[in-house]
């Protein structure tokens, strides 16, 4: 998960009991061995339709493992915080934000999928207490990591509030660490960082003004308005255009095997010099830090993928809208950014790419208010028509405007510039992901790289290439042709029988395996032909019911995870009992043939 990368261990040390402190919790609290139960009494309540972000994440919760969806983070604790102070601050946090008190009762359908959200005005929450014993600071950090990894794998009860779980690491009544696990239907990554800001103020005794951001109920009403529905419809058209014409698999290269890797390598890079260079590039190109970093990331990714065009998924996309920047909830909808990276000519440079990135990212962000059910159906429909299924391989998540600098400043000072720190592997099904954590004063980002595409040494080269490119671009326009020398990265290879078909690089051996595996024993032999960008599958069978439509349906159903293959454009079905020599296929009469796509097969 990305949750651990949000806080990045910004712990504040405590070594003694606070002077004059009394550890008395205010009200509605019971404590048993290792567990505190307290009540919250929030303002407001009610029910309404789901927000589009809630709907999206509830579908993901029903499909994916808890550790892929829940969010774990370790929050900084102000020095001298007692258990009583912490519990009261957490109570105030729950009472302050409706999203944390929102539940999702089962809907009337057969699958029970929720159709509405309900905000609980009051209820109970629990706080686990774990003594740190004689551990030092590093040992406490390790314990916090261990507890977070265990808790993040536990699913949330969607019918019960709150949407957060809390664990305090304590020495007597003094709190050393706060481990928080969040349900992604209640909070996204940016919301977590905003909650950390509130927590720090509340734990320090501050009185906060009422929350001024839109509540999930208010957001849902806006999304269901005529204006909201028009925006959603426009977003769907944008997605259809990109899914139909853009690359379905940006990292279609040697080494890609069906299915995702067990773990995705993760590292954290910090550099003050790179932040100064980034600022210089922004001044010179009149672009913001997000656009510049996205352009650099895209240029390096395209170089590694040995292609000139990419489709990038940007998380927290709706956070780019000022009205939702401080929303506490889950927006959790992707922006789909189709980018011509280049180089389109020998003199194409990073400045020009930054300009293209600004336009492409604005278009993607503007069209990121999505109905998840319709988007998933669109993905299926395009896969059926195109024969290639979109894979979210390259991802960017810009959290830099939301993470308080105090979280970064609380870490130990870097020992080098740039400093690279390896993090625990993450269970994320991506090929390459950039999490931008900070841009002002220090450039800080977390890079996740799939081992099928990047060995660990290459992942580190990629990360170190970002400040190298910024340093070169700070001095003036940087030709894209110089990326190879700057990065030290070699482009990925495509050995064997690869063909460029539309926007995709396709491994014909993978297509043959796809068709054979999809049909199984229904096919006695399979042959694949390629001519003028079209793939034709010839299938020998004794199955009288096997038609082009049935074959195509089976092949498309087997596509997920096979990112180097696509379904053939045309199928010819031959009735024949056994294997056939290659020279026999052209003379064999076809029983039926056609595209298999929502059109009648031509019977022979």
Task: Give the positions of each predicted feature.
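Short amphipathic alpha-helices and their capping loops
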Residues: 2-64, 88-135, 162, 214-263
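His-Asp-centered acyl/peptidyl-transfer active-site segments
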Residues: 2-4, 9, 63-70, 98-99, ...
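A short, small/polar-residue-rich loop/turn motif at beta-strand boundaries
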Residues: 3, 8, 31-45, 79-95, ...
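Active-site-proximal acidic secondary-structure segment that organizes catalysis
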Residues: 27, 41, 47-48, 130, ...
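Gly/Ser/Thr-rich phosphate-binding loops and adjoining beta-strand/alpha-helix segments
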Residues: 38-41, 47, 66-85, 158-179, ...
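Flexible, Gly/Pro-enriched loop and linker segments at secondary-structure and domain junctions
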Residues: 43-50, 56, 68-74, 100-106, ...
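Extended, hydrophobic beta-loop-alpha segments that form or line the acyl/peptidyl-thioester binding
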Residues: 97, 101, 196-197, 308-315, ...
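A short N-terminal helical cap/helix-turn-helix that marks the beginning
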Residues: 103-104, 199, 203-215, 240-249, ...
């Amino acid at each position: 998960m990305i949750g651990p990368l949000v806080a990045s261990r910004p712990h504040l040390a405590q070594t003694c009991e606070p002077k004059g402190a009394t550890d008395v919790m205010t009200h509605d609290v019971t404590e048993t061995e290792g567990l505190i139960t307290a009540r919250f009494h929030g303002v407001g309540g009610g029910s309404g339709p789901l927000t589009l972000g809630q709907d999206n994440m509830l579908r993901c919760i029903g499909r994916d493992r808890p550790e892929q969806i829940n969010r774990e983070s370790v929050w900084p604790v102000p020095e001298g915080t007692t258990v009583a102070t912490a519990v009261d601050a957490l109570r105030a946090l729950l009472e302050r934000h409706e999203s944390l008190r929102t539940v999702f009762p089962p809907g009337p359908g057969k699958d029970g999928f929720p159709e509405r959200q309900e905000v609980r005005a009051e209820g109970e929450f629990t706080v686990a207490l774990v003594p740190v014993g004689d551990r030092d600071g590093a040992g406490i950090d390790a314990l916090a990591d261990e507890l977070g990894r265990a808790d993040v794998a536990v699913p949330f009860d969607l019918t019960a509030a709150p949407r957060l779980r809390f664990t305090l690491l304590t020495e007597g009544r003094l709190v050393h660490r706060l481990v928080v696990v969040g349900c992604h239907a209640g909070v996204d990554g940016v919301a977590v960082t905003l909650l950390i800001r509130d927590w720090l103020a509340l734990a320090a005794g501050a009185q906060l003004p009422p929350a001024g951001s839109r509540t999930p109920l208010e957001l849902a009403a806006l999304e269901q308005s005529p204006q909201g529905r028009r925006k959603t419809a426009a977003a769907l058209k944008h997605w259809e255009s990109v899914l139909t014409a853009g690359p379905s698999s940006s990292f279609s290269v040697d080494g890609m095997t069906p299915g995702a890797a067990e773990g995705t390598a993760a590292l954290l890079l910090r550099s003050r010099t790179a932040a100064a260079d980034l600022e210089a590039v922004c001044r010179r190109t009149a672009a913001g830090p997000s656009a510049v970093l996205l352009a650099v990331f895209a240029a390096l990714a395209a170089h590694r993928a040995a292609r000139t065009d990419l489709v990038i998924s940007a998380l927290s996309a709706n956070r780019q809208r000022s009205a939702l920047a401080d929303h506490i909830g889950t927006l959790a909808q992707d922006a789909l950014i189709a980018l011509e990276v280049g180089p389109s000519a020998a003199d194409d440079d990073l400045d020009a790419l930054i300009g293209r990135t600004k336009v492409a990212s604005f278009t993607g962000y503007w069209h990121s208010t999505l109905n998840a059910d319709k988007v998933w159906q669109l993905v299926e429909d395009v896969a059926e028509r195109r024969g290639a299924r979109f894979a979210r391989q390259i991802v960017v998540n810009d959290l830099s405007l939301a993470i308080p600098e105090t979280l970064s400043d609380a870490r130990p000072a870097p020992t080098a510039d740039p400093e690279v720190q390896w993090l625990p592997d993450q269970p994320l099904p991506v090929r390459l992901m950039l999490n931008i954590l900070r841009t002002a004063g220090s450039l800080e980002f977390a890079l996740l790289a799939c081992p099928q595409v990047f060995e660990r040494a290459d992942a580190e080269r990629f990360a170190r290439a970002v400040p190298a490119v910024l340093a070169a671009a700070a001095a003036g326009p940087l030709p894209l042709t110089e990326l190879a020398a700057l990065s030290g990265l070699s482009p990925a290879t495509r050995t064997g029988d690869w063909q460029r078909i539309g926007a995709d690089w396709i491994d014909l051996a993978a297509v043959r395996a796809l068709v054979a595996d999809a049909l199984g024993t229904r096919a006695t032999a399979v042959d694949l032909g390629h001519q003028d960008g079209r793939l034709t599958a010839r299938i020998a069978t004794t199955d009288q019911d096997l038609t082009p439509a049935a074959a195509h349906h089976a092949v498309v159903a087997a596509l997920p995870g096979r990112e180097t293959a696509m379904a053939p454009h045309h199928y010819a079905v031959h009735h024949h009992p056994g294997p056939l020599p290659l020279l026999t296929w052209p003379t064999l009469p076809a029983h039926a043939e056609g595209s298999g796509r929502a059109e009648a097969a031509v019977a022979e």
